[in-house]
């Protein structure tokens, strides 16, 4: 009995010693962690906050950028032009998405030879909401217009994404090129805001099929816009892979050597007008124009006096040139209207 008690006593002392040694080891191991957190805990916390914000922004970038459901009826009702020759068209993209287009025809003098403008709108709404602007283009510029609703907008299928919008723009250009009643040598691109980024991408990939590009109140890139809109966070230090949508127009503009018109409203409260000036300066086009409207806001620059005159002069200049990309003289001009 005594031997048994001595055995259990030995085991108890051994377990206590082991526990004491383990606790000492744990304290030694925890000490560096405690010291590190004490010294750098604020930095670690900031990093965690930074990573969390980046994750949230990545997840909700589509929601913050596209707004296809605004206004609330945008996906249910698309207004159509009345009393004007037009076609309500549906086409398929390379990845099988069904898109809705409206082709508005100019029927005046020399209509078979008039230019065609592919119109890329900004975020929110649908092509029907852009008809007042488009119809004034029709009357003042004497052009055909093809308005496109990107995937996820209006009556088009799918969900909006950067690559998706690029595929949509390619599909529209391909469709225009199949129309025997449209002059393929006079295809102009027009893009406002988000549509400007789509137009720049399409032009950078199809310089041989596009006569000229016109962009209005658009941005350098989504990372640039994030730094502007969320200036209270160090967004400029986020690596590019953190952005689900990039729209790197400031890079792609270097591939747009066709005649280019940059339209800037200096009263734009959403996209800094300096971005339009920077795109103009980055453009390698031999014929580039910057039309500045001091009272122009983000969405309503087209209502400024002299707006359609600037577009008309640019289009006429391009058409008069036999080969816009091979002009012998470099011509750049800034017009304040």
Swiss-Prot record:
Domain of life assignment:
Eukaryota
What EC number(s) are associated with this protein in UniProt? 3.-.-.-
Question: What residues form the catalytic site here?
Answer: 193, 268, 298
Recorded hits in Pfam families, A to Z, give: Abhydrolase_1 (PF00561)
Please provide, in alphabetical order, the Gene Ontology terms of the cellular component aspect for this entry. cytoplasm; dendrite cytoplasm; membrane
Sorted alphabetically, which InterPro entries does this protein's record hold?
AB_hydrolase_1, AB_hydrolase_fold
Q: State which residue ranges cross the membrane.
A: 37-57
Recorded GO terms, molecular function?
palmitoyl-(protein) hydrolase activity
Does the keyword section mention Transmembrane? Answer: yes
Instruction: Supply one GO BP term.
Output: protein depalmitoylation
| Annotated glycosylation sites | 299
Going by the UniProt record, its keywords in alphabetical order are: Glycoprotein, Hydrolase, Membrane, Signal-anchor, Transmembrane, Transmembrane helix
Hydrolase listed as a keyword: yes
Q: Where in the cell is it found?
A: Membrane
Its membrane topology:
Single-pass type II membrane protein
Q: Which family does it belong to?
A: Belongs to the serine esterase family.
Q: Please state what the protein is called.
A: Protein ABHD13
What organism does the record attribute this protein to?
Answer: Mus musculus
